[in-house]
């Protein structure tokens, strides 16, 4: 059952198209008089207890099936070659089936910066087992309540999640990242997570892979909930009061380096990509995808140069305009 579900997730993730993307409602103000040479632009950033050379990473997607194994190997090769973080999909399938090797990418990619993922429904003992078996540089702990509720076989008991989060924060020996799955993390959740000791979150807003859409495609029910949650940029705007206390990672509908820059302008430490990279490895050879991802680094530098930003931190000084739904919501927030 798990294998079929994981393959369905891949299939439906690739087929869905979003008519709205909140990044399109942000315009950055160009600077006509440059201050820096292109080779002075520094893309490095810091989060989860370490310095990273580049402010983007391949976010959690898949595992738990033969198709998932194939995709994870491709993604690991891309990430290792490009020197970026790669986070596997939820390790729960391997916890249920010890023979599942679809997450085992480190042996063939020894220099890979590897993260892995587990659901908050799992007690900390399983999180510790995951870390022991995968040896990741960080552990994403995902919260996916709407997805669980829409899954016929999904979780129905949630009272333990907060105590689990407290346990993860205290006992997991590597940095943890509390991660949404495309519904947009709200500010109250960030506040509660902070009280439990969490210092890094992935807001993961609506606009990319929708697990509401995926589960409704599987069950044929409740498609009126396909657009549930906050868009990625809206979630990031909502989290502004927390950006000096909590490291904000952003994912959900990120398509290109310009979208990445817009996230960084609003205080993100780094940006995760899932479906964009999945589409690439399913369309092109691994070598071609490596070339595309390396090109993103060059594009980030040239955009930063045109905005007079030598560092990622400088981007938070960039002026911008908001339009449409994003402007309306932001105006409401200012009045509240």
Curated annotation (Swiss-Prot):
Record-listed FMN binding positions: 60-62, 90, 117, 179, 204, 209, 253-255, 274-275
Q: Which domain of life is it from?
A: Bacteria
GO MF annotation terms:
FMN binding; isopentenyl-diphosphate delta-isomerase activity; magnesium ion binding; NADPH binding; oxidoreductase activity
Task: Give the location in the cell.
Answer: Cytoplasm
Q: Which reaction does it catalyse?
A: isopentenyl diphosphate = dimethylallyl diphosphate
Q: What is its main location?
A: cytoplasm
| Protein residues bound to substrate | 5-6, 147
Listed InterPro entries:
Aldolase_TIM, FMN-dep_DH, IPdP_isomerase
Q: Which SUPFAM superfamilies match?
A: FMN-linked oxidoreductases (SSF51395)
According to its UniProt record, which cofactors does this protein need? FMN; NADPH; Mg(2+)
Concerning its family, UniProt says: Belongs to the IPP isomerase type 2 family.
Protein's name in the database: Isopentenyl-diphosphate delta-isomerase
Organism, by scientific name, is: Streptococcus pneumoniae (strain 70585)
